[in-house]
Amino acid sequence: MLLVLDVGNTNTVLGVFEATPAENGSYTYGRLIAHWRVGTIRTQTVDEYGVLFRNLFAMGNVDFKVIHGIIISSVVPPMDTTLRSVCERYFALKPLFVEPGVKTGMPVHYDNPSEVGADRIVNSVAAFEKYGGPCISVDFGTATTFDVVSAKGEYLGGVIAPGIGISAEALFQRTARLPRVDIKRPTKVMGTNTVNSMQSGFYWGYLGLVDGILERLVEEMGGNVKIVATGGLSPLIGAGSKYIKDVDDLLTLDGLRIIWERNQSNTRKREHGK
């Protein structure tokens, strides 16, 4: 089986894909049999992460011994060494990190391709593979990212905006009397108390940001663009958007699986020390 990890600034998502042996020592991959979302804790040790992984696998009835490959997308460089050690100590495997030099099958037309976060490339690969192009993937994470792929499968660029959670926390931290509130969709725009008014500002204001950016990106692309959203708040925001037609909670995990498949020959060489 294949273990995939998407390490974000706030959360880390793990998934396990079933695998069937194929010719030449490779595998074909099927459904996602288990996945989990945990907090990203930069101070945890290798053994603490090992215990966490064992507990998650036990909950999902997945055996450590059946994992034959690991691929990681990380936007938290200080954790990379720790995660590499976890993989080697607890799985006896060297993980494949999505980084320059890894085959993605997607040309990157960016001023400096190394600046593009691994998660953005992974999302773009999955969006194009699953939905076709041209397409835009929107990921609602700590930051909200919009990534554009051409009809030919080329990464063209995108937009990075503060996430809705950051915006809400900033308002709480910088004001004396406004409370923390849950992010939810109000029944109407006009609030009749402080909490409702804040929730309306967060939801409808952020929805305006999202749809405003998408409107302009679609216009720049000449229209007829597929748009897919992912990330923790994608169902909430996607439900109110005029432009988001598909919400795919597993987009990033599928992207990691696809990139792993495109690097199987390289990973076999690495595992055998060649």
Curated annotation (Swiss-Prot):
What exactly does this protein do? Catalyzes the phosphorylation of pantothenate (Pan), the first step in CoA biosynthesis.
Q: Which SUPFAM superfamilies match?
A: Actin-like ATPase domain
Look up the domain of life of the source: Bacteria
**Taxonomic lineage of this organism?**
Bacteria, Pseudomonadati, Acidobacteriota, Terriglobia, Terriglobales
Q: Is tRNA processing given among the entry's keywords?
A: no
Q: How the cofactor binds, per note?
A: A monovalent cation. Ammonium or potassium.
Primary location recorded for the protein, binned into one broad class: cytoplasm
Localization (cell): Cytoplasm
Member of which family? Belongs to the type III pantothenate kinase family.
* Record key words, sorted: ATP-binding, Coenzyme A biosynthesis, Cytoplasm, Kinase, Metal-binding, Nucleotide-binding, Potassium, Transferase
Q: Enumerate the residues binding K(+).
A: D139
**Which pairs of Cys residues are joined through disulfide bonds in the record?**
none
Q: Which coenzymes or cofactors are required?
A: NH4(+); K(+)
Q: Subunit notes for this chain?
A: Homodimer.
**What is the protein name for this chain?**
Type III pantothenate kinase
- Annotated active site residues, numbered on this chain, are D119
Name of a matching Pfam family: Pan_kinase
Instruction: Enumerate the residues binding ATP.
Output: D6, V7, G8, N9, T10, N11, T12, V13, T142
Is Lyase one of the keywords?
Answer: no
